[in-house]
Amino acid sequence: MQGKLVHFEIPTKDSSRAKRFYGTLLGWSFKDSGMPGIDYWLTEGTEPAGAIMKVEDGQTGHPIIYFGVEDIEAATRQVRELGGTADEKGPVPGQGWFAGCKDTEGNAFSLFQGDDSVPAPGQ
């Protein structure tokens, strides 16, 4: 999985409108992620997997791509050593760890390490 594009997220102010747009344009279908308190729709049948996520009014967004890594802590450390920035890792319960990053040119991306043993918050 090292370096493979594994996930993308498209921010939207209106998830119904965005689902209609991408569904019609690209033939995508969507399913509710089931994550409590978040308007987050997973693409079905796309490679890599993706999602449409609602952003709050006044926020702007840009698509975020996720690259797979074998060791998220080593990868975030390397991002910093190479002159980029990296957040501390955060959990994706039952799936793995992610970290938001920026490269030396200010481009945002995320890293993801699969680990299905990551517990839900409070567990």
Predicted regions and their residues:
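Amphipathic, alpha-helical segments enriched in basic
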Residues: M1, L5, A18, E44, ...
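Short glycine-rich loop/turn motifs that provide flexible caps or phosphate-binding loops at active sites
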Residues: Q2, L26, A49, F67, ...
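Core segments of cupin and vicinal oxygen chelate
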Residues: Q2-L5, E9-P48, E81
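Vicinal oxygen chelate
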Residues: L5-K13, K31, V55-Q123
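Aromatic side chains
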Residues: H7-F8, F21-Y22, Y40, Y66-F67, ...
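Conserved short beta-strand elements that form part of the metal-binding/catalytic scaffold
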Residues: W28-H62, A108-D115
